[in-house]
């Protein structure tokens, strides 16, 4: 039995079976490449669901991690820390928002944004107590905690977890008339992924986000953009909402915010929204900890200094155009923006992902029939050509 087989066996024996990973063990990683314990090399075309936009173990991020780890790693929010204010300033100036509230995981940040929206609805908009509603979209993925699960339209994400939370309405993604029909006097917010990731890289119709912005302005409703996966350069823009030149009232960021090293997430908004939180009304022991802030400061610097949004736009256009040239009866559609691309098939995607793994290319199926490609944004054109050769070979 190989070392990889031993690891997989003990993992399956002791671990809850809530994941079905590809049968590969990753023991080393650098840039866009990973290795298994046997020394086999693979190209990472998933980036931990966009958490590794800067590439594995980016030297600037690792250096920031090491330097901070030698000083202080955690103090809780009971005390001030040296670099939280610096990180606040950087992320607020980058987003154009006045206030930031840090958490750890994406789901925590979504929960935080929903709490802010509800409290804003009661304290600012004067919706009657316990009547606030939030509109979300079919096909959404906002996390695995109870509020995001209650928002989901995926039966398996909800099965056995009832009673689900109330106060949510769901409409079809891309249907502006459905959004109009769902808005009423109790609507507090519209929560949307500017590009739906888990649903299969679903890109909204051109101008759709602008229409939502206009509806929110007309009805005094908060526009909440979940940019956890599509943001921070992944779509070819710094924020995926930039494709429609709109600014949401609330940004939710995570994943690449931690540079593929530590979990850190944030809710960004102006004083009117985040000002609803008072001392004791929300919190997180690890949220905004010194180690995460140091890592995130470096992660943001890499995104800007290396123009990762621009790289994603240029290389994504090339990659998508080359994928569209592949003529195979199983391919239904190629879609995406930047280096955030899905190949929708008319059959199961898993066997193709397994074949690509055998070719040295790691990716993951989503919603059964879509192959998702989201490589680190530091990838070179030559490395993309390597990936294209492997993709072409499995469709021959």
Swiss-Prot record:
Claim: Membrane is one of the keywords in the record: no
UniProt pathway annotation: Amino-acid biosynthesis; L-proline biosynthesis; L-glutamate 5-semialdehyde from L-ornithine: step 1/1
Keywords, comma-separated and alphabetical: Amino-acid biosynthesis, Aminotransferase, Cytoplasm, Proline biosynthesis, Pyridoxal phosphate, Transferase
InterPro entries on file: Aminotrans_3, Aminotrans_3_PPA_site, Class-III_PLP-dep_AT, Orn_aminotrans, Ornith_aminotrans_bact, PyrdxlP-dep_Trfase, PyrdxlP-dep_Trfase_major, PyrdxlP-dep_Trfase_small
GO CC terms in record: cytoplasm
UniProt-annotated location(s): Cytoplasm
Catalytic activity: a 2-oxocarboxylate + L-ornithine = L-glutamate 5-semialdehyde + an L-alpha-amino acid
A Pfam family of this chain: Aminotran_3
UniProt GO MF annotations: identical protein binding; ornithine aminotransferase activity; pyridoxal phosphate binding
EC code: 2.6.1.13
N6-(pyridoxal phosphate)lysine modification, residue list: 255
Cofactor annotation: pyridoxal 5'-phosphate
Enzyme class: transferase
Any one Gene Ontology BP term: L-proline biosynthetic process
PANTHER family: AMINOTRANSFERASE CLASS III, ORNITHINE AMINOTRANSFERASE, MITOCHONDRIAL
Function in brief: Catalyzes the interconversion of ornithine to glutamate semialdehyde.
Protein name: Ornithine aminotransferase 2
